[in-house]
Curated annotation (Swiss-Prot):
InterPro entries in alphabetical order: NAD/GMP_synthase, NAD_synthase, NH(3)-dep_NAD(+)_synth, Rossmann-like_a/b/a_fold
GO biological process: NAD biosynthetic process
Similarity comment text for this entry: Belongs to the NAD synthetase family.
Name under which the protein is recorded: NH(3)-dependent NAD(+) synthetase
């Protein structure tokens, strides 16, 4: 079995999907988790205005609506939280995403003060916090806020990790990579677009250029620029298609480099890193 085949099998990616079937699978998955854990009454998710959080947010809202209808328990709810660092340049996109999601509760927690305070506290030791490192502090500050809200609302935190992001490990460890449940896992980027289209989303919500937008020295840098490979190439690879030698090498290099992000903290019994 080639490495490409191993990765596809591990991430569970299908070459062709039925969007309606995958929507139902994710909604049922989210409902099943709530049913298994009756002390949980909500889902919490940070909404950036990008494709992934827009899709995960709408799926979560559908899940809690069905839970209310099926159980008669109106305490189930979805909490969408905006987590800007100061003023977000594409705030209009985030508001359009919220309008599409129609969350039960929409909140805003501005992370600038907390992220800046942590950066300042660390630099007070004499350490230098790079722009890239501060970007990770921002991502982790956002997850702190989401878990604080989940604690207040008897909730679980939804993550937006999907196959195209997972294969490249394009997420912050214990930041956006830290969550309780991943309803998009198994889908690549173009398949996520198909689900949003099937849900009736405005194409503007999933056709915008994806960006993590964490670095102040490189504001709005596109994911594809940071990765050195396009999402179309990543998606083709994950669907078992042939890609250029350069694209394959880049994708597989990210896969190897990011292995530590896909595991809990390493123990003496772990072998993957040796």
């Amino acid at each position: 079995m080639s490495l490409q085949e191993e990765i596809i099998a591990q991430l569970g990616v299908k070459p062709i999907i039925d969007p309606e079937e995958e929507i139902r699978k994710s909604v049922d998955f989210l409902k099943a988790y709530l049913k298994k854990h009756p002390f949980l009454k909500s889902y919490v998710l940070g909404i950036s205005g990008g494709q992934d959080s827009t899709l995960a947010g709408r799926l979560a809202q559908l899940a809690v609506e069905e839970m209310r209808a099926e159980t008669g328990d109106n305490s189930y709810r979805f909490i969408a939280v905006r987590l800007p660092y100061g003023v977000q340049v594409d705030e209009d996109d985030a508001q359009k995403a919220l309008a599409f999601i129609q969350a039960d509760v929409s909140l805003t927690v501005n992370i600038k003060e907390s992220a800046d305070a942590m950066t300042k506290a660390v630099e007070a030791t004499g350490a230098k916090v790079s722009d890239f490192n501060k970007g990770n502090i921002k991502a982790r500050s956002r997850m702190i806020a989401q878990y604080a809200l989940a604690g207040s609302y008897s909730g679980a935190v939804i993550g937006t990790d999907h196959a195209a992001e997972n294969v490249t490990a394009f997420f912050t460890k214990f930041g956006d990579g830290g969550a309780d449940i991943l309803p998009l896992y198994r889908l690549n980027k173009r398949q996520g677009k198909q689900l949003l289209a099937a849900l009736g989303a405005d194409p503007a919500l999933y056709e915008k250029v994806p960006t993590a937008d964490l670095e102040e020295e490189k504001p709005g840098i596109a994911d594809e620029v940071a990765l050195g490979v396009t999402y179309n190439e990543i998606d083709d690879y994950l669907e078992g298609k042939s890609v250029s030698a350069q694209a394959q090498e880049t994708i597989e290099s990210w896969w190897h480099k990011g292995q530590h992000k896909r595991h809990f903290p390493i123990t003496v019994f772990d072998e993957f890193w040796r």
